[in-house]
Regions:
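Canonical Radical SAM [4Fe-4S] cluster-binding loop centered on the CxxxCxxC motif
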Residues: 1-12, 16-19
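C-terminal accessory regions of radical SAM enzymes
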Residues: 195-197
Length: 197
């Protein structure tokens, strides 16, 4: 069972992330054109985006991770696909902003676009949407528009967004980068006008 695996503790993760960022910056100190003051500022990060590498709420210590970032005066952003409803509901440490990805207006498109590996993924997402308004932090629905895949049925999106009652809605275009290129092409990238339509 994956929940029985060993995981790094939050302090180790944060210290490792800061160290990794500092390692990336070290080469810039040899550049005469680099702004040393800005480089020194970058060595002491103050923002953390907990996202991109899968579902962050799968990490069993996500609440403690957010709490440790908060103790270090970080502004913390968490991006979730809403699959670990109980973990979201049980957060005691609020991130500065909680994003919930909503990339389909209905279950059929959700199953095609998101390709969930669990049977109740659509139900989980909807439960997370219903939970979103209970957070004390800022909340945001994030929608990635994929041309030819999920840019339809705006009235269904509207109902889901109303259910969540977020502070913000962020609509953005899909970018053909990373492993998504294995299943999508540049033709799936909508233009700005198509996104705002």
């Amino acid at each position: 069972n994956w929940e029985d695996e060993e995981y790094d503790d939050p302090k180790t993760i944060i210290d490792g992330a800061i160290e990794a960022q500092n390692n990336l910056l070290c080469g810039f100190y040899g550049n005469d054109k680099a702004n040393k003051k800005k480089l020194d500022e970058l060595k002491k990060p103050t923002n953390a985006a907990i996202s991109l590498a899968g579902e962050p709420t799968l990490y069993p210590k996500i609440d403690e991770l957010i709490g440790e970032f908060n103790r270090r005066d970080f502004t913390t952003f968490v991006v979730s696909n809403g699959q670990c409803v109980d973990r979201l509901r049980n957060l005691e440490n609020d991130p500065y902003q909680l994003y919930l990805s909503l990339d389909a207006p209905n279950e059929k498109i959700f199953n095609t676009v998101c390709r969930p590996r669990i049977n109740d993924a659509w139900i989980n997402l909807n439960e997370s949407l219903e939970t979103l308004s209970s957070f004390n932090s800022r909340t945001c629905i994030r929608n990635t528009c994929v041309k030819g895949r999920n840019m339809e049925n705006p009235e269904e999106y509207a109902k889901l967004i109303e259910k969540a009652n977020p502070d913000y809605v962020e609509v953005k275009a899909y970018m053909c980068v990373g492993s998504s290129r294995d299943r999508l092409t540049p033709d799936n990238m909508p233009t700005f006008d198509e996104v705002t339509e």
